[in-house]
A protein has these predicted regions:
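The catalytic-center signature of Zn2+-dependent metalloproteases
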Residues: 100-199
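Active-site-proximal segments of metallohydrolase catalytic domains
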Residues: 2-94
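Residues that flank catalytic or metal-binding motifs in active/ligand-binding sites
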Residues: 10, 55-57, 89-91, 109, ...
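Surface-exposed helix-capping loop/turn segments at secondary-structure junctions
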Residues: 1-3, 124-130, 215
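Solvent-exposed, flexible loop/coil residues
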Residues: 33, 82-85, 147, 193-194, ...
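Structural recognition of the beta-strand scaffold that forms the well-ordered cores
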Residues: 13-16, 58-63, 91-97, 113, ...
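Pan-zinc metallopeptidase signature
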Residues: 193-215
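Short loop/turn segments at secondary-structure transitions that flank enzyme active sites
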Residues: 20-22, 67-69, 101, 128, ...
Length: 215
C-alpha cells in the first residue's frame, strides 16, 4: 500500500474503570433504563444527562438502543470534540448498541465505529473535512499526511482519487510526505469506509497528543 509507511501506533490503552467516582468498586459498566431519554437531533445530550462520570477521570461512552438522525440518514454514533464549547459533563461518545462488540446483534463493523468516534473525542476530523481544501495545514482535517478527500466516497473501499492537491502545504511540525498525487486514504479510521478502516497516521497521532496537552 502507498500508505504502509504512514501507519502510527497511537500508544493509547483503554481499560474499564475499576472504581466509580465515589471510590466504590465497579466493572466499569453501568446499565440504566431511561426510555424518556430520547436522543433526537434537537436533544443529543439527553442520554448524557441520565448518568455521567467526571470526564477528567473517565472517558464516558453511552451505549444506546437507537439514535434518531432526523433526516432519514443512518447515525451510528456521535461524539463531542474537546474544543466544543459545551459542558464537560457531555464530553464523550454516544453509540448504538449494535455497533459495539462482535457477537450477538453486533454489526460487521468490528468496533471501528467506536474507534472513529473516539477519534473525534481526541480532536480528529473526518478525512473528507472541507473537501479538497487548499493547503493541508490550513484546511481539510488539518493533518498533512492524510491526503485531501472530496467526500465520504459513499462509504466505499473502492479505489478513488478525488483531489489533486495532495502535495500542497506542510510544515516542520505537520509534514506532508507526498511528492505526487496519491489515492484517497480509505483505510483511515476517520473516513466512512468502515469495511477497510485499519490505520491512523503519525500526523493524526501528533494532533491527538497536542489535544491531550491542550485540554
Amino acid at each position: 500500500s502507498v500508505f504502509s509507511n504512514l501507519i502510527a501506533d497511537m500508544e493509547i490503552e483503554f481499560r474499564l474503570a475499576q472504581k466509580d467516582p465515589n471510590g466504590n468498586c465497579t466493572q466499569g459498566i453501568t446499565r440504566t433504563n431511561a426510555p424518556s431519554a430520547s436522543n433526537s437531533p434537537s436533544n443529543r445530550n439527553a442520554p448524557k444527562s441520565v448518568i455521567n462520570w467526571d470526564p477528567y477521570s473517565y472517558l464516558n461512552i453511552w451505549v444506546v438502543n437507537s439514535i434518531s438522525s432526523g433526516s432519514g440518514g443512518n447515525t451510528l454514533g456521535f461524539a463531542q470534540f474537546p474544543s466544543t464549547p459545551q459542558s464537560a459533563s457531555t464530553y464523550g461518545v454516544v453509540i448504538r448498541a449494535d455497533e459495539v462488540g462482535m457477537i450477538g446483534s453486533a454489526s460487521s463493523a468490528d468496533g471501528r465505529t467506536l474507534t472513529h468516534e473516539v477519534g473525534h473525542c481526541f480532536n480528529l476530523y473526518h478525512t473528507f473535512q472541507g473537501q479538497c481544501g487548499t493547503t493541508c495545514q490550513f484546511s481539510g482535517d488539518l493533518v498533512c499526511d492524510t491526503p485531501p478527500q472530496f467526500d465520504d466516497l459513499n462509504n466505499s473501499c473502492n479505489f478513488s482519487n478525488s483531489c489533486s492537491n495532495d502535495i500542497n502545504g506542510g510544515t516542520t511540525s505537520n509534514p506532508n510526505p507526498f511528492t505526487s498525487d496519491v489515492p484517497d486514504q480509505t483505510e483511515n479510521y476517520m473516513g466512512y469506509a468502515i469495511g477497510c478502516q485499519a490505520l491512523f497516521t503519525p500526523g493524526q497521532k501528533a494532533r491527538v497528543y497536542a489535544a491531550f496537552n491542550s485540554y
